[in-house]
Every structure is written in C-alpha cells, then in structure tokens.
A protein has these predicted regions:
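Secretory targeting signals
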Residues: 1-27, 55-135, 174-194
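Helix-loop-helix units of permease transmembrane domains in multi-pass membrane transporters
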Residues: 27-60
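Extended hydrophobic/aromatic segments used for targeting, binding, or gating
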Residues: 158-184
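Junction motif at the cytosolic side of a transmembrane helix
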Residues: 140, 195-216
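Alpha-helical membrane-inserting segments
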Residues: 67, 71, 75, 79, ...
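Transmembrane helix-loop junctions in multipass membrane proteins, especially transporters and channels
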Residues: 73-85, 143, 163, 167-171, ...
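Central hydrophobic cores of alpha-helical transmembrane segments
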Residues: 144-158
Length: 216
C-alpha cells in the first residue's frame, strides 16, 4: 500500500518534494540571492559551475529519496511482512499461467527485495529529474513560493497538456514510476528516461547562463 500510495500527487509527493527535492534544487537560487555567483564562476568557470551543480542536484536528490525510502521500509519490515501471503499466491499463479512479463523480478529468489529496490530507485530517479527541473527554473523564477510549488504545478500542467493534446505515453513523464517496474529492462528504461530528460534540462540551463553572460 505504501509503495502504491507514494506515486502520483498526494501527501508523499509533497513531503518528498519539500524535504528531498528543494534543498538540492534551490542551491542556484541561494547562490544568486547571496551574490556568490560572481566569486564562484570566476574561480571555477560558468560551465564547470553549471554541470557540477546539476550533477550534485541529481545525485543528491536521488540518494536522499532512495536511502530515505529504503530506511523507512526497512523499519516497517520489523513489524510488517514485505510480501503478504495473498500477494505471494497471486504471483505464483501468474507464473503458473505463463505470464512471462514479470520473469525477472518474480523468478528471482530475492523477489521482494529486488522489487522494492527497483521500485524505489525508479521513483528516486523521477524526483531527481524534478530537482533538476526546479534547479534550472530558478534561473528565471525568483519567487521562492513558485519554485517550491513547481513540482506539483509541473505534474498538473503536464497531465492537462498531455490529455488535451493526446500526447503519446513516452511524453507523459509523470506515468513512469515504481509501479511501472516489471522486469529489469523496465527499471533501466525508466532510470535512463529520467537521466536523459535531466541532461536535456541541464543543457537548457547552461544555455540560459550563457545567454545571461552575453547580455551582461
């Protein structure tokens, strides 16, 4: 239940956005507010500053979500089973019926652990992408409240645009999360998907910095 309820818009999304995403995503906003940019960019260079901060933002948010959720679920294991008997029976039934879609995770001897690790890692990559997006947006958006609300606004607006324009699934980034994990390839595809999106956002951020430099 906790794994499923942690996806989409809700209390989990708000908590993760505030506690994990924003501390890393607002580093550029903080540097600009305190006039650190001139000093840092002079010593390290704009390109180095840009990409080093983007990498720290992505990896920091990823590890924060991954390790935090892993610790939380590990504590729950002390009182609750990772996989209920009814769930185990359903999985065995799928295997007997020849459902090969879940062959990697179900047939693994450590299926519960593998499933939770893959699911949590996929969600962590998603939140890392949101952190990078807020980080890049802080180049243009100065209002802290708007930046803090950006993850929720981004998901709402993305859903509205995708439904209105009939966009294909690969453009609906908000649908990719831990519940989409069935095989190892699913996990690799989702993680790679958000990694590529984060890189593209990073390129946009770098171009914005270059443009600001040219404009003086």
């Amino acid at each position: 239940y906790l794994v499923k309820s942690s996806h989409g818009l809700g209390a989990f999304f708000g908590v993760f956005s505030v506690l994990a995403v924003l501390p890393f995503a607002l580093s550029y906003w903080e540097d600009r507010r305190n006039h650190y940019l001139c000093f840092v960019e002079t010593r390290a260079g704009k390109t180095t500053y840009c990409w080093s901060h983007l990498c720290v933002t992505f990896l920091g948010a990823f590890l924060c979500i991954f390790l935090g959720m892993t610790a939380a679920y590990s504590l729950l294991l002390l009182k609750m089973p990772m996989l209920r008997a009814s769930d185990a029976e359903s999985l065995l039934y799928e295997i007997e019926m020849g459902d090969g879609k879940r062959n990697f995770l179900i047939l693994s001897r450590t299926f519960p652990q593998m499933y939770f690790i893959a699911s949590i890692a996929a969600d962590a990559a998603r939140y890392a992408f949101l952190a990078v997006t807020v980080f890049a947006a802080s180049e243009k958006i100065k209002n802290l409240f708007v930046l803090a609300s950006l993850p929720i606004l981004l998901e709402y607006v993305s859903q509205i645009l995708a439904d209105s324009l009939g966009l294909p699934r690969w453009m609906r980034w908000y649908t990719f999360n831990g519940t989409s994990i069935d095989t190892l390839s699913d996990f690799l595809e989702i993680s790679g998907y958000f990694l590529i999106l984060s890189f593209l956002i990073g390129v946009v951020f770098w171009l914005l910095i270059r443009r600001r430099e040219l404009d003086g």
